[in-house]
Amino acid sequence: EAADNNNKALIDKLAAEFSDELANLGVRVADLEAKTDNVKWQGLIRYDWKSNNFAANPGHEKTNDGDNTVKLRFEPSMVINENWTGHARIDYDVNKDNTAADDGAEVQKIYAEGQYSKFNVKLGRFGTFSDASHGLVMDDQVTGAEFTYAPTEAWKVKATAGRTDVVNKELVTGTKTTDAATYWAVEAGYAQGKWDAGLGYHTVLDTHTNQKTNENNGSYHIVDLGVGYAFDKNVKLTGDYAWGVSQDKYKDAANNAYSIELDYKGADAADAGSWGAYVAYRQLAPFATISYTYDFGAGDAGVASLKGWEIGANYTFTKNIVATAKYFNGKDTAAVAGKDDKATGVFTRVDFLF
């Protein structure tokens, strides 16, 4: 008991002598914990397998254009202050034919996002989406700025401007050797109850284009609109349309694009056993879409020219493991005249999320 009293007295003496140091240490630990909470990580491991068959491919009755890749993705988010956050996406892709696994990492996104009441701004390299037409026209990265204003819960307007590298170089003439171009768009959207609708205007600026009406202007324009109706919490129907322009090189392809899709439920990564399915009929066009959100769209020439039916389903095997399968059956509207234009495709994906 005497020893315990002596130890207690020694502890009290040391605590009094080093009280300032202990207090400062506590502050530093608290600051470190706060800083740690400022950065959060998420990501996935993804395996994709895709096969497209185009009967019109010269010299082949039926050719297979395959895609077999593994992806590792990291997505950090950082709190800057009460209004601003930072975001990034880093992808490391490995193709099946690259056994050395040295395809390398690529920073797909890096941007700052600010939120001030009803006003949102993104600056840097970020993902943009054509909300008006549910992704019929655009779903890819842009380096620039995007401003969104939502005056009410039902209405919002969005303006996007910057550089993008997803404008297919096959669509331009002259000395162009990359897919880069200047892109800007304005959109207005409405969502209330079971309904949503939108209207958008998109412009691509470049040196020259292969369209008859605009050969020396260096730009082309797309107007898109869409509407969606949710019959209940499980079933939703969407219809989207995009007006493009006439073209020279791909004159057999459609000028306009559209998509009609019926969705049932959908897999939830947090809910094992959840699933969803959809059926859609689409027509894509080289000058009416830029970087569509669908997995099927490019024909044998590498431009958006597929038309036909698409079905798909997804399923959550266990928490954070989701599988997807899709099938396309239709035709390639840009196929060589006189050749069979039949086109089919299969797409599968497994996501391991963390």
What is each PLM-predicted segment?
Residues 1-46:
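N-terminal periplasmic/intermembrane-space "pro-region" immediately following the signal or transit peptide
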Residues 38-51, 61-201, 228-229, 254-293:
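Outer membrane beta-barrel
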